[in-house]
């Protein structure tokens, strides 16, 4: 959540369809504080699709006198959690934690053939092993795929 809340409009590259993740947001002694990410590999540039870019552009277009240095999401972690809980209740689905969205995103990419090394970089994991430890259960069909390749 901290990486998301630290994003500014300057971090978005509409031409190259990327977002630069280069800082983290925290509340320290009731103050909004921007810090460096946890690890060097947490600093990264990720590709995003047109849907994400259009949402950010709409936020820019509807903001009051926006500046590139403005936060894209000026809400609290608590507010995000509350809004997600409300959405889940309205949709009559089990409660989802914000981190579950990250996990679902990673699982979706991995199950659709995205290389584990690429995924690890996207997530900002310091070691690929971390990504493997969390997501290796997503690839149960890998043995079948291996057999298909070998049988060609």
Tell what function each PLM region has.
Residues 16-21, 97, 108, 120-138, ...:
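Short functional hotspots where side chains directly engage DNA or cofactors
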Residues 46, 54, 61-75, 81-121, ...:
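Short, basic (Lys/Arg/His-rich) helix/loop patches that form interaction surfaces
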């Amino acid at each position: 959540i901290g990486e998301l809340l630290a994003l500014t409009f300057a971090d978005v590259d509409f031409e190259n369809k990327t977002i630069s993740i280069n800082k983290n947001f925290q509340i320290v002694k009731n103050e909004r504080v921007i810090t460096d990410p946890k690890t060097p590999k947490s600093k990264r540039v990720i590709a995003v699709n047109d849907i994400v870019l259009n949402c950010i552009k709409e936020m820019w277009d509807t903001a009051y006198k926006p500046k590139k240095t403005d936060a894209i999401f000026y809400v609290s972690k608590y507010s995000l959690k509350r809004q997600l809980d409300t959405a889940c209740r309205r949709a009559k689905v089990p409660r989802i934690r914000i981190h579950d969205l990250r996990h679902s995103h990673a699982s979706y990419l991995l199950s659709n053939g995205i290389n584990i090394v690429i995924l690890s970089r996207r997530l900002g994991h310091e070691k690929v092993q971390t990504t493997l430890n969390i997501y290796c259960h997503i690839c149960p069909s890998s043995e079948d795929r291996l057999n298909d390749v070998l049988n060609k």
